[in-house]
Amino acid sequence: KVMDEKNRPVTRAIYNIIGINRDGYKDLLGMYISKSEGANFWLSCLSDIQSRGVKDILIACTDNLTGFSDAIKSIFPQTTVQTCIVHQIRNSIKYVASKNQKTFMKDLKQVYQAVSKEQAEVELDNLELKWGEDYPIVIKSWRDNWDKLSAYFQYSDGIRKMIYTTNTVEGYHRQIRKVTKNKGVFT
């Protein structure tokens, strides 16, 4: 909770942008509070970090927040945008019947753990052949988002492990929650 313009406590989300440099050093680039997110919000956040010295972003891993990928491409056009695989999996499994989840996940794992993008596409075709009739919305989501879900295949295994998920920022959020969970309101 934060205090609003009328000094009342309101619930707001805090959006964090964390960068990792070539040496693996992590840095909090910005914390932003907003009532809602969207392209204009993300444009202002990215313009802010650019004005404070960020010259380029090689790879951005996002959880597919509304307007974020477009804003990244607008401010930093050379950036490779990778949608978090873990978020995509969580969103997918919600639509799969519980009795099929274990088998479906085993088949899906063949897609995102493939050795190459080409192999992943073959595995995605296999997934669709096996599960497409039962779960067309899941397959459609993977197909529609494939460019951003498969961007990490162009990098080595070491880089892939860092960028296929938003675990870096999620870990930071866990640390913040530990410190702030007993705090009532931020002013």
Residues of each region from the PLM?
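Short, well-ordered secondary-structure micro-motifs
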Residues: K6, I72, V96, Y152-F153
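RNase H-like nuclease fold core
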Residues: K1-T62, T66, D70, I75-Q78, ...
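A generic hydrophobic-helix recognition signal that picks specific residues
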Residues: D56, T80, R160-I163
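Amphipathic alpha-helical transducer elements in NTP-driven molecular machines
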Residues: T11-I14, A39-L43, T62-S69, V86, ...
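Acidic/histidine-rich catalytic cores and adjacent linkers
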Residues: Q113-T187
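Conserved beta-strand -> loop -> alpha-helix junction used to position metal-binding or nucleic-acid-contacting
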Residues: I59-T66, A71-K109
